[in-house]
Amino acid sequence: MITSELSDFLEINEKNSVLRGISASDKILSSGICQLLFSENGHWRIPNGGTAVALFLKNSTERYYRIIVMEPSADPDWEPTVQFDFLIRDKKFETMQEHARLLVFEAESRYIGLNFYDSKECENFHNSVCKRQTRSTDKAKQPALEGKTKKKSSFFHDPFKSHREPRKQVEIEAPTDFRHVDGVKLTDVQEDLYMQVNNPEEEEIVKQLIVRNEDHIRQSLMVKKESQTVKEVKDKNKDKVKTSKSFFGRNKPKVEDVSQPIVPVITGDPLNPDWTVTAATSFKHSHTFSADPIKDPSVLLNRSTSVRVRGSLSTPRIPTHRDSYRSATKPDTVPKQTPPPTHNSYVLPHIDERMTRKMILMKNHQNLREEVLPFELEVGNYVSFPNHTHCSEKPIAEAPLRPPVRPAPIVPTSAGLCLVLAASFPTSSTPSRFLNPFPAPLPAESFFGNSKSKIAYFIKPTNEQPQELFQTPVQIEKIFSSTPSSPVSNAAIIDGMKNISLSDSSTSVAQDIAMKVPTPLPRTSKIISASSPLPPSQDEINPLIEMVDQSSSKSETQIPVTECSQSHLNGKGSAAQIQSADFDKVLNQLLSIKVNSEKSKQSADLELLLVSIEKLIQNYLGFHHED
């Protein structure tokens, strides 16, 4: 850290170089730019070094003073060059100032000179060296304060006992402006000023004094009133009550009959009082109050009653001599009114009210559980009741009953698999505050679909026999006459679709269903319109049959329902020869017709068309997977 004692003629890098050359515990007392001189044969000789910096250091840790002359370096990598280093061992060491810029001192049996650049730095350096112990020497030379004389010890004198010398009469002075506090009185002039108000200006001054010092004046009046208050005076002439001197017959205070208040008797003219009458006789009964009548214990209020007695308006209670002012000023304590009984709490004379309420709550809770339990078993949403229910809580509102959701139509296939749309699963909407501890387990399902298809299917295995939905078993046998080991070709499916004649009975039903569906699935073909919510007509089915027939004639291949290998393919061509664009186009048409057909009413012809389309979709998906 750069200190202020370093010379102002040094640059920052030179000051840092100087600090690197000294110890961290050294303190710089004075410094200056100078030139080192040695005396030889009565002449001053300049050493080989250049201009340097003279430092006067103090080290309190090692307790020494030192004079160092070093040449700082502007390069931070170089250490400063020390030209002269002298440790001061003599306490009387001093420097001599030959002229304004030259200091001379004796060291190592010869004279050393310091030729300073600035005369002020030379003077400061000289004063620091000569006055390095000024504080300690000043304290030593300062005489001690004159204290008490030393006590002499002898055989008849104890030095530990304090001895006070008698003071002379000259040392005692008369008090200045001495007055007795109790005897302070107003002079005649002051009394005239105090008693008389000559003009309105003086009256205004008095009013201002009263307003400003109101608290002090009131406090003074209260003190005077308390000092003039007459305490109870004992009458010695009254007859003493004779009591037994036994332990149980103690002296009891006599109760004075003060049923009628006694008014102080004032004799004579009030404006001209008789000063011969003592204050005790005139104020004897002025502070006597009437005592409270003794009440019968049967009349006292019971704190357990809930009726609050209100009487007529009466004067505030006057304290007696036996009561304190604090207890007399408190309002009469009236028992608190008990809260009105609740509608479902019963007050029994000899049974605890809390236990009775608990028993009633348990009974109500059991009845409520018996009423709600059959409903819970039917619906399936179990409501958890808390163990302790407060009687003031509101009853839990029952969950609204939802109409049963119609499940999606189950389409039987020849492989014994039930295909159900993922969007057709019913979603259970249970309120957040109702718990469902026993949810229905979900069946083991597997995902089946195509990356390019628009609908994903969940297939769940079933061991049940497929339900017969058609009234024409001959057509079903014609289409699904083969087993899963022998796949059905597209040509056989197309032959069955040509014999289907759609009826117009499902048109009105399809219009109602289309109002509930916000957006139909996208259709990329020009044959079926995307905005048409009606089921497919015969005109829409015929072009589709032609497209399927053409694509089947190109491949002449039978595509199985499940994943097939090259051994399952029959015909001259392979599945890879058919263009993917034709399959995508036909697949989109099949999916669109299937969705519209599911919306309409279930009829024999429409169900047969739906099964045929489903079979074609499976063939195309199986082919695409194999491709």
Curated annotation (Swiss-Prot):
Q: Which Gene3D superfamilies match?
A: Pleckstrin-homology domain (PH domain)/Phosphotyrosine-binding domain (PTB) (2.30.29.30)
Annotated region (Disordered) at 310-347
Q: Which GO terms describe its cellular component?
A: cytoplasm; nucleus
> Out of the domains of life, which is the source?
Eukaryota
**UniProt domain WH1: residue ranges:** 21-136
The cross-references to InterPro entries, in alphabetical order and at most eight, read:
PH-like_dom_sf, WH1/EVH1_dom
UniProt cross-references to SUPFAM superfamilies, sorted A to Z: PH domain-like
Question: Which protein, by its recorded name, is this?
Answer: Uncharacterized protein B0280.2
